[in-house]
């Protein structure tokens, strides 16, 4: 049986007929995101509407002032409604060494471009709430939605950073 759970995880269950005792059971035989496979941190809403996940746990709430303790009220900062002067009224804060459920590959996004160019593109885009920047290729990937940020493993330190838009 294939099941899609409310948190976005995909499960496969196998029906086992147990000989002798007559108790038959459904057993989970696969989960797309699990401690055995891809980290649960890559589930879009692992940490609710926003948060930083590391080692299968929600550990922080990224804010313009830095990482704060995570709770279920953690959310993206508000951005001003769009008008001609919006770009001047927004800033960005950096969350280092993270990605989300959409892995940023070598050729994903636009570029090469500098971080400031990517900030301008996001500032000019009404739906952009932030972007992911791949440092090794100077690639920019705008995001209209950001939920759980997954901390990258130590071997990927310095590879991808998120820049979150906020109202100054």
Which residues does each predicted region cover?
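Beta-rich ligand-binding surfaces for carbohydrates and other polyanions
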Residues: 1-168
């Amino acid at each position: 049986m294939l099941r899609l759970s409310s948190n976005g995880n995909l499960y496969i269950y196998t029906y086992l007929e147990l000989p002798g005792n007559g108790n038959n059971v459904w057993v989970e035989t696969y989960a797309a995101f699990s401690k055995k496979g891809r980290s649960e941190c890559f589930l879009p809403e692992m940490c609710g509407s926003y948060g930083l996940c590391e080692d299968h746990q929600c550990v922080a709430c990224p804010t313009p002032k830095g990482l704060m303790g995570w709770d279920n009220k953690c959310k993206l900062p508000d951005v001003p409604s769009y008008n001609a002067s919006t770009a001047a009224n927004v800033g960005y804060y950096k969350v280092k060494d993270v990605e989300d459920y959409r892995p940023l590959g070598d050729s994903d996004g636009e570029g090469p471009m500098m971080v400031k160019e990517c900030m301008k593109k996001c500032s000019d885009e009404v739906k952009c709430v932030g972007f992911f920047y791949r440092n090794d290729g100077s690639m920019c990937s705008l995001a209209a939605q950001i939920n759980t940020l997954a901390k990258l493993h130590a071997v990927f330190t310095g590879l991808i950073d998120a820049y979150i838009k906020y109202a100054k």
